[in-house]
Amino acid sequence: LFHPEQLISGKEDAANNFARGHYTVGKEIVDLCLDRVRKLSDNCTGLQGFLVFNAVGGGTGSGLGSLLLERLSVDYGKKSKLGFTIYPSPQVSTAVVEPYNSVLSTHSLLEHTDVAVLLDNEAIYDICRRSLLDIERPTYTNLNRLVSQIISSLTTSLRFDGALNVDVTEFQTNLVPYPRIHFMLSSYAPVISAAKAYHEQLSVPEITNAVFEPSSMMAKCDPRHGKYMACCLMYRGDVVPKDVNAAVATIKTKRTVQFVDWCPTGFKCGINYQPPSVVPGGDLAKVQRAVCMISNNTAVAEVFSRIDHKFDLMYAKLAFVHWYVGEGMEEGEFSEAREDLAALEKDYEEVAAEGVDEPEGDDY
C-alpha cells in the first residue's frame, strides 16, 4: 500500500514540545520530506493538492506538522491543502502542554491550510461506545477506522464514478466563506456494527438526519450552539438525487439546524455510486449506502475557546515556557499565536452575528 521509500522515520521524538518538533528535530528531517514530496509531485500530471494528517497535542504533529505546511506553501503556493487535525479533547488528555502545542500549531494551520477538518479522540471514543458499535474499550485502531471512512468519502469522487462528483477544490469553494473561517466539523452515518445492520432500516432520510445529530460530530462541539454557514453532504452507494433533495428539504425545516441568514442555500451534495467498503473483520458493517458530512459551523469556536482557556491558565504563570525557549523559540511567539486565536474566535462571533447588524469596518 505504501512504498517503503516514501516512509520517513526519525530516531528521536519531539518530547511533546512544539519548539522541538518545529525547530530542532523538524529542521533536520523536513528537507528529506520535501525532497520525497517533490519526487512524487514530479510524477503527477496534474497535482491537485495535499492531504495532511496530524495531531496538534504532541510535539511532532504540531511542530513538524506546522513546519511541513509552511514549507509546502512556499514550494507549492497555489495547490490546495486539506488538513485532518486531531485536537485535544476536553476530558481526555495525553500531555500537560497540549494547550501550548495546539495554540502554536493552529497559528500556522490558520495561514497554511485551505480547509481543516477538526477531529478529537474523545468525540470519536463516544461514537464508538454509544453508537450501534457498542465497543466497550475502543482502541486507536477503532478510532482510525471511523476517521478513515470520512477521508475515504471525501476522496471517492476522485477515484470512482458518480452522479454528482465533488473534487477537492470544490470543498474549498463551497465551504469557506472567508479565508480564516475554514475549520470544519465532520460526521458520518451509519455507524453500525455488523450484528445490528440486518434489522436496521438505513434509508437516505435516516442517515441524513443522523449526520446532523450533535452526537455524530467527530469533534466535541455542539452544532446547536452555533449556526451553519455551509455543509457538504457526500453520499455513496445506492442513492439517487431525488431522495437526497427530499432529505435535505426535511433538514431545512428542522428548528435545530440553523443557518446564518446570509447563506440561504447552504447545501452542497455529492453522490458516488461506489458503496462504502469496510476493513474485513472490522467493527463497521458493510452497508448499501452511507453519507459523510463536512460542515462549517460557528460552534467550532468552542473548540478553540476551550484550548485558549487552558493556555491562559498556564501562560499566566509562564509554566513550562522555558522548555520551548530552550529549543530556540522566542517568548513573543506565544503571545502572537494566542492573539491570532483570539482574533479567530472574534471572527467566528462576527460571522454568526452578521446580518443582525453589519459589523463596523470590514476585516476581509
Curated annotation (Swiss-Prot):
Q: Which cofactor does it need?
A: Mg(2+)
A biological process (GO) annotation for this entry?
Answer: microtubule-based process
Q: Which UniProt keywords apply?
A: Cytoplasm, Cytoskeleton, GTP-binding, Hydrolase, Microtubule, Nucleotide-binding
Query: Which InterPro entries does the record cross-reference, listed alphabetically?
Result: Alpha_tubulin, Tub_FtsZ_C, Tubulin, Tubulin/FtsZ-like_C, Tubulin/FtsZ_2-layer-sand-dom, Tubulin/FtsZ_GTPase_sf, Tubulin_C, Tubulin_CS
Q: Name one GO molecular function term.
A: structural constituent of cytoskeleton
List the GO cellular component terms. cytoplasm; microtubule
Q: What is this protein called?
A: Tubulin alpha-2 chain
Which proteins does it associate with, and in what oligomeric form? Answer: Dimer of alpha and beta chains. A typical microtubule is a hollow water-filled tube with an outer diameter of 25 nm and an inner diameter of 15 nM. Alpha-beta heterodimers associate head-to-tail to form protofilaments running lengthwise along the microtubule wall with the beta-tubulin subunit facing the microtubule plus end conferring a structural polarity. Microtubules usually have 13 protofilaments but different protofilament numbers can be found in some organisms and specialized cells.
Task: Give the record's family classification.
Answer: Belongs to the tubulin family.
Q: Where in the cell is it found?
A: Cytoplasm, Cytoskeleton
Question: Pfam families in the record, alphabetically?
Answer: Tubulin, Tubulin_C
Which Enzyme Commission numbers does its entry carry? 3.6.5.-
Q: Which Gene3D superfamilies match?
A: Helix hairpin bin, Tubulin/FtsZ, C-terminal domain, Tubulin/FtsZ, GTPase domain
Question: Could you tell me what reaction this enzyme catalyses?
Answer: GTP + H2O = GDP + phosphate + H(+)
